[in-house]
Structure formats: structure tokens, C-alpha cells
Amino acid sequence: MAHIDINLISNTMGRSVDFTLILPSRPYNIENYDAKTDKYYQDKKDKLYPLIILLHGYLNDEKAWTRYARAELFAEENKIAICMVSGENKFYFNQEAKTTKDNFYDFIEYELKDYLYGTFPISPKREDNYIAGLSMGGFGAIYHGFSNPKAYKAIGAFSPAYTSMIEDGIDAQTIVRNCKDAPFCYLACGSNDFLLNDSNDLVNDLKYIKADYYYDFVEGYGHEWRFWDLELEKFIKSLKRTDPYK
């Protein structure tokens, strides 16, 4: 497994952007032994990994999912690449900035993906791409997934900010309600989470557009990392994968 910290000079952002990529190890098998060279060779060496773009919450950064949760372990166990990008506190959508370009949507959807697909053994196919996040990152996953449904097979939203952000001019609800052919949405929230109403509003909107979704409502949890760690693993296990590493 590789843990790669990358600082990329971004044209869409007008500055360098930090992100972390977890790339699982190639599977080895005792049957993959070449007696002539006395070496084991990698199974599926020409196959591409599926990808989860995993977004952090407010006040965190691209390291949060590896500091407070087991993102590396889940990536390795499930043979799935995970990319975590710094969204600062900007909610992952394009917005005006005085001295820089805060084009977070364009960066993720175009520049970041183009770099990942062109540099690493990662599949660009829709059926192999997923996006997920917690809180602010849950908003980002919803915003990206429903804005660009042809790019993602599934969305994971853990304790997402949603309707509570509308009064601040941050609106994903309109995008969800107008989405056609929405990806599968895995939604999770704890009973003690202060954003519980946001999750309930999202459920109503998913029903309104007749989207395929699963809502994991769990008693006893608040807005906390123990919950998000559990839900990330559940989300990965729920994916209906078709890639060679499933």
C-alpha cells in the first residue's frame, strides 16, 4: 500500500493544492510464482483500481480521514484507491475570491481526476468512481454527485450539511431536486447529531426524485469520528462493485 502526499500546482485554483492518495498494494498469490526467475509476480497487474474521492469536514484538512479514521485500512482491505483533497472551509463548490480562484468544483471534477487517471492505475469509468464525505464533505459529495451524476456510481453522505446551509447561500437542495438519473446515495446520521434535520430533508428529496438510496439512522451517535469511521466502512461494503478487485 502507498500513502502519497501530493502538492499540485492547479490552474483551476490559481495556487498549489494539497491532497493525499491511498493506493492499495497489488494482490500477490502463492500460485503466482515463476520458478524460472524465483520471483512472485503481481496478480491483476494491468487492472485499474476503483476510486473514492473522500471529503473532509469543516475545520479539517485532507489528513483528517487518516488521522481520526481508518481510511488507509479500508482502502487496503477492499483494494480501492481513496483520494482526500483539501477543501479548506469552502464547501467544495466554485466561488468568487479576491486573490485566488476558489474553483473547488472544477478542480475536483476536471483537474484532479485528469491527474489521477493519467498518473496512477485508477479507472476513469463511472462504474468505478465514488464520492463521499462527512459534514461539510457530505455536502460536497452531494453537490458533486448530483451535479455530475454521470461521473459517479454512488455517493456517501455521512452527517451531511444540507438544507441548514441554504440561508448562507450554499444550496445543494435545488441541485438534488433537479437531478435526473441520480447515483445511488448512501446516507448516514446519528440520533444525537445536530444536523439530523438536514439528513431527514435529504431523505424527503431523494424520495421526491425517486432516487435509489439507503439511510443508516443510528441511535446514540452525534457529530463524531467514531460514527464516521464506522460508516465509511459500511459505505465501502455496500458498493455494488464490478471492478477486478471486488
What residue spans do the PLM features occupy?
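Non-catalytic cap/lid and distal C-terminal segments of serine-dependent acyl enzymes
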Residues: M1-K246
